[in-house]
Amino acid sequence: MEKFANHFGYNRMFAKDQLTLGVHIPIENYQFHAPTMEKQVELVQKAEQYGFTGVWLRDVLLQDPDFGDPATGQIYDMMIYLTYLASKTEKIAFGTSATVLSLRHPLRVAKEIATLDQLFPERIMLGVSSGDRRADFKALGVSHETRGEKFREAFAYLEEILYKNFPSIQSTLGEVNGANLVPKPSKRVPTFITGFSQQNMDWFAEHGDGWMYYPRSPMHQAAAIGQWRELVEDYHPDVFKPFIQPMHLDLSEDPNERPTPIRLGYRTGRKALIELLNIYKSIGVNHLFLALFDGQRPADEVLDELGEEVLPHFPAL
């Protein structure tokens, strides 16, 4: 994509017909217990050394037993913890999966993202979404039913305030006249619509720099990617936009074990994992980040096996 021709983090992660790998925080097999959040700096540094290209964090406020996520994202605030981890690394990119624009004022998001991009140039990836956790919406006094409309308005505000000097913004979210956001990002921050964000596919084919969608089987994912890319071509002829997805992984000690489905992913040995990742690559997935939450083995042990045996097949670009 021409607008990212000289963007360091983007070009390590994304290229047409290529697949790179990332990791989901926490790098821990906590399953349905609260994670300890131990050794995350050490594990992220190890992931960087092995050639993983991205680290992804979630935007969650409250523990909600009805939602089934004891980690509440990664327990710590997404932006603060991202800053902490990024300060301990050198080149791996950090992404939000995803910043809930319906719950965060876009001016605050712009200030945070621009600051992060100045502190860690060309290493920030901005996933944005409308959100889905009712407890967070209720606690903030925000309507869950109108989150799609709020998302669109916040997205438009964010684009204006981040990339225009002294913009004129008239919005229900606020007005900007004769004022300017400082700092500005060092370059455009790659911005990915996450899920459908309560929009139709035409909207996020037109807007954003790529699409991040939930993990699904290759057959189902291929259909969605194909439909989306046809629409992208209609709105932006000859422009490449990357497709991103997470995948839960329970890596077997037996390298020859065949895949069996688990929640949001697969249990498999490494040989079949390489085959599976190549299938995802063939259908147009450009970056896949692995969540080790549901694994049976210690996460550091799994990370070593992935780094030594799987990453060489899907290196940084």
Model-derived features: positions:
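A structural motif
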Residues: 52, 121, 208-209, 285
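Conserved, mostly hydrophobic/aromatic
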Residues: 47, 51, 59, 85, ...
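Internal, glycine-rich beta/alpha segment that forms the wall or movable "lid"
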Residues: 2-17, 69, 102-207, 226-227, ...
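Short, acidic/polar
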Residues: 35-47, 112, 193-203, 268-280
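An alpha-helical appendage that flanks or caps ligand/catalytic pockets
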Residues: 1-17, 145-181, 214-317
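Active-site mouth loops of central-metabolism enzymes
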Residues: 25-38, 99-107, 187-196, 258-271
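Hydrophobic faces of well-ordered beta-strands that scaffold small-molecule active sites
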Residues: 21-25, 55-57, 94-96, 124-128, ...
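N-terminal beta1-alpha1-beta2 module of alpha/beta enzyme domains
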Residues: 1-88, 189, 293-296, 305
